[in-house]
């Protein structure tokens, strides 16, 4: 009974400590890129007396919650940005480094996956169509008939044709000579 009470008190105290801790505010800047312009949105709630700084230098005439950077340049406009009010601290910085282009389109992961799957399905479909088309074409083709009798030479007028004249460019194989290529399939040496 004592152990149950001990474990119960321990669990309640751990829960109480976990709920009473001060959670640090997790404020996040919002970045929106459209064409060659980049828009930063300040995470602070107040709209009054907002100031923007870039790399420690205050940006003049930028007191709105949204900071729009037209014709963003990766070299000139990249750096640390912070928005703050005189009453708040400058403790949440945003490091911005972006590449922009005028005619870029952002594609998410699901769109890329769908494009790849559709491409594979179309390719496999075309392969199946070509396979069945060629299979049907072979079945409809006339079989190749050979001449009468054994062998592939046609019989008839060419029956009395003499054997071809040996080519003088090649030397005939001598029977007494045992070279590497002097005969075919002669395994007994």
Curated annotation (Swiss-Prot):
Q: Which residues lie on this side of the membrane: Extracellular?
A: 23-108
Q: Which residues lie on this side of the membrane: Cytoplasmic?
A: 135-189
Describe its function. Part of the TCR-CD3 complex present on T-lymphocyte cell surface that plays an essential role in adaptive immune response. When antigen presenting cells (APCs) activate T-cell receptor (TCR), TCR-mediated signals are transmitted across the cell membrane by the CD3 chains CD3D, CD3E, CD3G and CD3Z. All CD3 chains contain immunoreceptor tyrosine-based activation motifs (ITAMs) in their cytoplasmic domain. Upon TCR engagement, these motifs become phosphorylated by Src family protein tyrosine kinases LCK and FYN, resulting in the activation of downstream signaling pathways.
Provide the leader sequence positions: 1-21
Pfam families given in the database record = Ig_5, ITAM
Q: Which InterPro entries match?
A: CD3_esu/gsu/dsu, Ig-like_dom, Ig-like_dom_sf, Ig-like_fold, Ig_sub2, Phos_immunorcpt_sig_ITAM
Gene giving rise to this polypeptide: Cd3e
Membrane-protein topology: Single-pass type I membrane protein
The disulfide bonds in this chain are 42-83
In its UniProt record, a GO molecular function of this protein is: identical protein binding
State the protein's name.
T-cell surface glycoprotein CD3 epsilon chain
Question: Which keywords, in A-to-Z order, does the entry hold?
Answer: Adaptive immunity, Cell membrane, Disulfide bond, Immunity, Immunoglobulin domain, Membrane, Phosphoprotein, Receptor, Signal, Transmembrane, Transmembrane helix
| Organism annotation | Mus musculus (Mouse)
One Gene Ontology term of the biological-process aspect is:
negative regulation of smoothened signaling pathway
